[in-house]
UniProtKB/Swiss-Prot annotation:
PROSITE patterns recorded: UBIQUITIN_1, UBIQUITIN_2, USP_1, USP_2, USP_3
Family: Belongs to the peptidase C19 family.
Gene designation per UniProt: UBP7
Catalytic activity: Thiol-dependent hydrolysis of ester, thioester, amide, peptide and isopeptide bonds formed by the C-terminal Gly of ubiquitin (a 76-residue protein attached to proteins as an intracellular targeting signal)
Record field: compositional bias (Polar residues): 382-399
Start and end residues of each stretch annotated as Disordered: 364-401
Identification of the protein by name: Ubiquitin carboxyl-terminal hydrolase 7
GO molecular function: calmodulin binding; cysteine-type deubiquitinase activity; proteasome binding
Length: 477
């Protein structure tokens, strides 16, 4: 770690710490936070010329206390906050108590609500936070530089959100996100453009899946896939011949397709698991239409569903939005969407779940009272997650392992308000470990009632669900 000062115009920024295990781009992000000069405009003189984003610090000969010179024009569009974050431990005890319960909001840096809402949903996953906290700052050769930088920036952002009681300006994270995915740096008339939250969500999970699956303190070599990934068993049938084939596909989310027939999430999921595609037929020797039917073959700890609300409208040359109301539950059972093999694995945990719930209701559970495929009545989803964040049912037995039941509890909703994906506003609604719901509208946070969360189902110009995340209901066997 080195400490330097930087002279820019008439200002001198004293005692800036440089983490030499991080690339110079991170240092430039620090300077952006202080000066408002974007990294791409920064010209910093070092030994051998200008400081490059991926330079090796050990070759630059920097010394503690050295003064560096920076040139560049500040960005007037987005300015760093004048005051830094206020941390919980710096507040009086009475204020600390008043602010406990949920993390801080995120400052909108200029059409960054898509990013803010995505990160507020992801930070609600304690297992992901644990994996990130164990991630090392020193990059391994198996991770590319920008993926490593984004993973470290995510770790630091989550840490700051947990400590701060005032809204955090995610400037360093945002700069690294744009470095990794330049589409998020697009400008229109000098302003940053609104982006698609689903694209941000998908890119974040992909990046973290690449960096966190490598050798680390984690017991799971592919932690992100274990948390969010599911396997689909795809069966293909050619409509013009008797050809049939099957393949396995790994995905991080399911799609809820919306049509005039779809009124509920479950119906949309069924539509999303069926479709048509064109591919070469070996027997016909030409391209033919195949019917594709998918079944879920493995379940994730956290199930993500995207409502396919946006489509390309040629007349206006932009993404238009389907406003149709599609209801979704606090509690989702996807047993009937699973493959035959997976259903067999779920039968015993589901039966034990029925027995436990029957005992709670003062009833004598019996296997004869319901068939294997019947819907399972569950306790109120508001109280289904224990305080550690583990969605589970039944007493934890020593040595017992948790098993999937195919039943999930809603833990976060990402909504969009507006008529186009390229405009409008994104907001996150996140269930806390206490069972309470909090709305994260950029820097503003507010408590919400659980019954109001399922009203974000669309049908007008109000906030409507675009991405929902459910947590698995587990049972010890």
């Amino acid at each position: 770690m080195l400490t330097v000062s930087v002279k820019w115009q008439k200002k001198v920024f004293e005692s800036i710490e440089i983490d030499t295990s991080q690339p110079p781009f991170v240092f430039k992000a620090q300077l952006y936070d202080l000066s408002g000069v974007p990294p791409e405009r920064q010209k910093i003189m070092v030994k051998g010329g200008l400081l490059k984003d991926d330079a090796d610090w050990s070759t630059l000969g920097l010394k503690n206390g050295q003064k560096l010179m920076m040139m560049g024009t500040a960005d007037e569009i987005v300015k760093a906050p004048e005051k830094g974050p206020v941390f919980m431990e710096d507040l009086p005890e009475e204020q600390q108590a008043a602010n406990l319960g949920y993390s801080a909001g995120l400052v909108n840096l200029g059409n960054t609500c898509y990013m803010n809402s995505t990160m507020q949903c992801l930070i609600s996953v304690p297992e992901l936070k644990s994996e990130l906290s164990n991630y090392q700052s020193a990059r391994t050769k198996d991770v590319d530089q920008t993926s490593h930088m984004l993973t470290v920036a995510t770790r630091e952002l989550f840490s700051e959100l947990d400590k701060s009681v005032k809204a955090v300006a995610p400037m360093p994270f945002w700069m690294v996100l744009q470095k990794k995915y330049p589409q998020f740096a697009q400008l229109h008339n000098g302003n940053h453009m609104q982006q698609d939250a689903e694209e941000c969500w998908t890119q974040m999970l992909y990046t973290l899946s690449q960096s966190l699956k490598l050798p680390s303190p984690s017991e799971d070599p592919d932690a992100v896939k274990a948390l969010f990934g599911l396997n689909l068993l795809n069966r293909l049938h050619c409509q013009e011949s008797s050809e049939e084939s099957s393949e396995t596909e790994s995905v991080f989310s399911l799609k809820c397709h919306i049509s005039h027939e779809v009124n509920h999430l479950h119906e949309g999921l069924k539509h999303g698991l069926k479709g048509e595609l064109e591919k070469t037929s070996p027997s016909l020797g030409r391209t033919a239409v195949y019917v594709k039917e998918s079944l879920i073959d493995s379940l994730p700890r956290y199930l993500t569903v995207q409502f396919v609300r946006f489509f390309w409208k040629r007349e206006s040359n932009q993404k238009a939005k389907i406003l149709r109301k599609v209801d979704y539950p606090l509690e989702l059972d996807i047993y009937d969407l699973c493959s035959e093999d997976l259903r067999k694995k779920l039968e015993a945990p589901r039966q034990k779940l029925r027995d436990i719930e029957g005992q709670k209701l003062g009833l004598q559970a019996s296997a004869k009272s319901s068939s294997k495929g019947d819907d399972v009545k569950m306790t109120d989803a508001e109280g289904s997650s224990n305080q550690s964040g583990e969605s589970s049912t039944g007493d934890q037995q020593e040595g017992a392992s948790p098993h999937m039941t195919g039943i999930y509890d809603l833990v976060s909703v990402l909504t969009h308000k507006g008529r186009s994906a390229d405009s409008g506003h994104y907001v996150a609604w996140v269930k806390q470990e206490s069972g309470k719901w909090v709305q994260y509208d950029d820097a503003n946070t507010s408590l919400q009632r659980g019954e109001d969360i399922i009203k974000l189902s669309g049908g007008g110009d109000w906030h409507m669900a675009y991405i929902v995340m459910y947590k698995a209901r587990l049972i010890s066997m």
